[in-house]
């Protein structure tokens, strides 16, 4: 009987819950029969289709378009107008000082312009917990558009104002926007999605980063905005995604987990579940809502507390490793060689920007492929396989670059190697680290976890930009062996440590790490004062909420119904 009750409680995740949440009692008999019919006849494919509600799609697309898209766009948008921006720096300097700018000073100013984006990203990451606690996930994303719009106006007006400092400050502010976006957006998507599609929805972040990179490359073509007279408009375009998000996201609710566990607003949380999952699917979140019974008086964990907590030690280490490998795997270094490799392959210099679009296209297609298969293959194969393939192709690229003058067809192999590295990265390592950060931690730990992940991400980004020129100068084409080693090290670590998180609840993922951590979260510790024979040593969960009572009554009622049928 106990085994049967446990099984039916889990099967409740397939039954509709949302149409009647106004009272704590069980639903009517006729309704329960219909729901049990749904339990018996529901097909996995049908459930998967229902998971993708219109509201969920709009929230993910609007959230990503105004957030991760802008991050990707700002990674590539400065490449095409580089000569014109440097000329603008020189003209501004000469107008103020009466002499041309020194080449070393120009190089320094340009390096600051590019790298200050990462500094702003770090600042934005450190602001996440403070802003997110007050505003929540959705309103933090909305407020973040203020940074994007102000940065766009500064950068777009810098030429007209004759002040290159406006461009530098704008890049810094845009970095703040990116730091907040890459922490809050994955959190938001993770918390509004059912576990069956949490990976696919989380991959939207990476897909829109790639689309942003591709858009920056496309708009930077001379036929569009990549001309001397129009390059400021490349930065003005940033306003468009921000405005789209401001006009669409307010009509959607905040994260139901945030509303329930942090704001303790059960009515709004239930409505949020209904909006995102559809009324027939709200009960899919019952298993995750049960977490609220343990975390009713939730207190956000600080970064220092999370780093010290023994029961999440390996989760934290794994997030640090994956985020460090995400930036240190060498993808940014690939762009340094792209133009020269395309040139050696016989592509005319005027055509190289158009051929470079293929790299952005490969990025986008690989990210979309990952989003389509992640719930079938899982996180482990895509992440470990992605790093492993990158190590293999980096080794191949080292050989082809070393021998590229030996035969006319060798540079074409280098092009294939570059595209293969990009595809390997975007099919797994390009997005899954953000998904794992959201999946590894409970509600109270998640903001601190994203601060740690974001800090590692942006510091690693800055380190690559700072150190790669010296590595390249010292090792030349052999520099890619350094990145191959990093990728292989990451793949080996993840092979032995990373559990599969596909289709698992947050509690199940935490349990998967418990043996390795050799410690359990405080709420899982046994308290003999509140245990009895029925709970077998586990703490009895006391709930006073309307939602918990409703779920409890519903489970009992459906168990009785199933018992009568048998």
From Swiss-Prot:
This is Solute carrier family 2, facilitated glucose transporter member 9. It catalyses: urate(out) = urate(in). High-capacity urate transporter, which may play a role in the urate reabsorption by proximal tubules. May have a residual high-affinity, low-capacity glucose and fructose transporter activity. Transports urate at rates 45- to 60-fold faster than glucose. Does not transport galactose. May mediate small uptake of adenine but not of other nucleobases. One of its GO terms (biological process) is urate transport. It is found in: Basolateral cell membrane; Apical cell membrane. The modification Phosphoserine is found at residues 9, 514. The lineage of its organism: Eukaryota, Metazoa, Chordata, Craniata, Vertebrata. It comes from the Eukaryota. Belongs to the major facilitator superfamily. Sugar transporter (TC 2.A.1.1) family. Residues 1-31, 524-543 are annotated as: Disordered. One of its GO terms (cellular component) is basolateral plasma membrane. Glycans are attached at residues 74, 90. Residues 524-539 have a biased composition (Basic and acidic residues). PROSITE patterns: MFS, SUGAR_TRANSPORT_1, SUGAR_TRANSPORT_2.
């Amino acid at each position: 009987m106990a085994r049967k009750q446990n099984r039916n409680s889990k099967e409740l995740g397939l039954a509709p819950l949302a149409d009647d949440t106004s009272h704590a009692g069980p639903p009517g008999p006729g309704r329960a029969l219909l729901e049990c019919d749904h339990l018996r006849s529901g097909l996995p494919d049908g459930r998967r289709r229902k998971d993708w509600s219109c509201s969920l799609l709009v929230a993910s697309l609007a959230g990503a378009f105004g957030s991760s898209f802008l991050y990707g766009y700002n990674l590539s948008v400065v490449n095409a107008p580089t000569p014109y921006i440097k000329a603008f720096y020189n003209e501004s300097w000469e107008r103020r000082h009466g002499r041309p700018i020194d080449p070393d000073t120009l190089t320094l100013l340009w390096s600051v312009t590019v790298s200050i984006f990462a500094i702003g990203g770090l600042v934005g990451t450190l602001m996440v917990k403070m802003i997110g606690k007050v505003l929540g996930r959705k309103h933090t994303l909305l407020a973040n558009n203020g940074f994007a719009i102000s940065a766009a106006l500064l950068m777009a007006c810098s030429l007209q104002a004759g002040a290159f400092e406006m461009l530098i400050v704008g890049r810094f502010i845009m970095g703040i926007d990116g730091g907040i976006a890459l922490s809050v957006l994955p959190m938001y998507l993770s918390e509004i999605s059912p576990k069956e599609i949490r990976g696919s929805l989380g991959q939207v972040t990476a897909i829109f980063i790639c689309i942003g990179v591709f858009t920056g490359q496309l708009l930077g073509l001379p036929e569009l905005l990549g001309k001397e007279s129009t390059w400021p408009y490349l930065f003005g375009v940033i306003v468009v995604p921000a405005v789209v998000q401001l006009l669409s996201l307010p009509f959607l609710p905040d994260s139901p987990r945030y509303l329930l566990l942090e704001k303790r607003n059960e009515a709004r949380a239930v409505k949020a579940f209904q909006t995102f999952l559809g009324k027939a699917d709200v009960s899919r979140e019952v298993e995750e809502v049960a977490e609220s019974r343990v975390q009713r008086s939730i207190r956000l964990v600080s970064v220092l507390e999370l780093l010290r907590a023994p029961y999440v030690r390996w989760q934290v280490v794994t997030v640090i490793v994956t985020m460090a490998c995400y930036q240190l795997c060498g993808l940014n270094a690939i762009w340094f060689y792209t133009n020269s490799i395309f040139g050696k392959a016989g592509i005319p210099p005027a055509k190289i920007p158009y051929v470079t679009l293929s790299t952005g296209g490969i990025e986008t297609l690989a990210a979309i492929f990952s989003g389509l298969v992640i719930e079938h293959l899982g996180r482990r194969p895509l992440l470990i396989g992605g790093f492993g393939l990158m190590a293999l192709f980096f080794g191949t690229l080292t050989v082809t670059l070393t021998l590229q003058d030996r035969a006319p067809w060798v540079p074409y192999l280098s092009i294939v190697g570059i595209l293969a590295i990009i595809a390997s990265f975007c099919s797994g390592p390009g997005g899954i680290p953000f998904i794992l950060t959201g999946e590894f931690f409970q509600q109270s730990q998640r903001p601190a976890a994203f601060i740690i992940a974001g800090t590692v991400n942006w510091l690693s980004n800055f380190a690559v930009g700072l150190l790669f020129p010296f590595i390249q100068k010292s090792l030349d084409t052999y520099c890619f062996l350094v990145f191959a080693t990093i990728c292989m090290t990451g793949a080996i670590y993840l092979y032995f440590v990373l559990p599969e998180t596909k289709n698992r609840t947050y509690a199940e993922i935490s349990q998967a790490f418990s043996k390795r951590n050799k410690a359990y979260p405080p709420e899982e510790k046994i308290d003999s004062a509140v245990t009895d024979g029925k709970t077998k040593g586990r703490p009895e969960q006391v709930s006073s909420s309307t939602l918990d009572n409703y779920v409890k009554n519903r489970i009992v009622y459906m168990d009785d119904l199933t018992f009568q049928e048998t």
